Amino acid sequence: MLLTSTLLLPQQAGIAEAAGNSQSMKTKIMLDNYPLDFQAEPIIEQGNTMVPFRGIAEALGIEVLWNAKDKTVTANQMAADGKKVVVLQLNQKTAKVNGQAVQLSAAPFARTGTTYIPLSFFSKQFGAQVSWDQKTKVVSLQSPPKKMYSMAFYAVKAFGERQYIPQFDTVGFGWARLQEDGTITTSGKDFYWPQAAGEITPEGIVDQAKQEGTSPYLMVFASDRKNELTKMLEDSALRDKAIADIVQLATDKNFVGIVLDFEGLGLSGDIGKAKRDFNEFVTRLAQKTKASDLKLSLALHPLNGAYQGYDYKTLATVADDLIIMAYEYTGKKSPEPLDKVNESIKLALKEVPKEKLVLGISTWSENEKTISSVIGLAKRHQLKGTALWRLGLIGEASKAQIDKNVIPLKS
């Protein structure tokens, strides 16, 4: 998804010819294989593909400042190799990049309130990979690597990819769950405390993660398939015991945080009550985690999914971050529809600051050809980061694509 190498546009003459042969077609821009919306269309001008600067730049996480007096545009990019400051002046073919003069293939210009620059400049100066399809008039950009929060989950059958743990900022270990009687256990059928593998113990894996700079979180799973989650939330005694047991387990086992994956609320019934009950649980849990110096993360169903029992706005005020589980839209082992993933992000952003949102990505759904596009949406919307479900499913090919896109904060 994130590609550090650059590709120059094909011969600009070819672009001009394509424009002449397909006047009825509008130029379309794809960023990380997903359409980028524009208030103004790209323009073919004297053989150069000119694009609205602000729209692409901000989608790449670049800050754009306009100086009306000097008629200059300043772009500030925090790139993987440091900060880059680019100053463009209207109607001038020379730009300044970190104070050094750089020639452009065409001078930037303003039209109907929009500043246009040569598309190739994004490749040369901002690390985006660019290509052009003459037949379809589609400009494709691949965003450069971005330093952002990276999380992964370690649960059943994850042992075979434990070598990836140090390559994430945080790993959530799914070793506990809510039972049907409303109590917490580490001996569930699907989420359980694993046995040692020779000399390698689960406690040792957690301790080694900490030593290597990865924050280990205890992940606690719950389902409402048999009403067990609702039962616990509505019973104050069960609720308080679950909170105490979760915090005690996390502290006893040397975790630095807790991530709740409480699923199934709000499919039917009193959705408002489901939200209030979960809010109450999380608020009480947050009081205990703060007192114990533990972080708190919540993995939540997306707002455009079937389960509506999650009050993103309120939950974000008490948790450290929210993970949007933007997957399982189709129920099939196939890539998630990007329109739905994008919609889930936009809905969440209406309720929660982007700095508190993490995009959950299922590596059961995605593969090495699609995962870059999903990560691209997290970058486009400038979310806190990504969370991968899960180790054991990623594979070398997908991991290589992840590494091309995301640079962990710990790096």
Stretches found by the model and what they are:
Residues 1-167, 178, 218, 253:
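Primary recognition of N-terminal secretory signal peptides and signal-anchoring hydrophobic helices
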Residues 146-151, 179, 183-319, 324-341:
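Chitinase-like catalytic core of GlcNAc-active glycosidases
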Residues 249, 361-411:
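Substrate-binding cleft of secreted/luminal carbohydrate-active enzymes
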Residues 220-221, 228, 348-373:
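Active-site clefts of carbohydrate-active enzymes
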Residues 171, 260, 322, 359, ...:
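Conserved, mostly hydrophobic/aromatic
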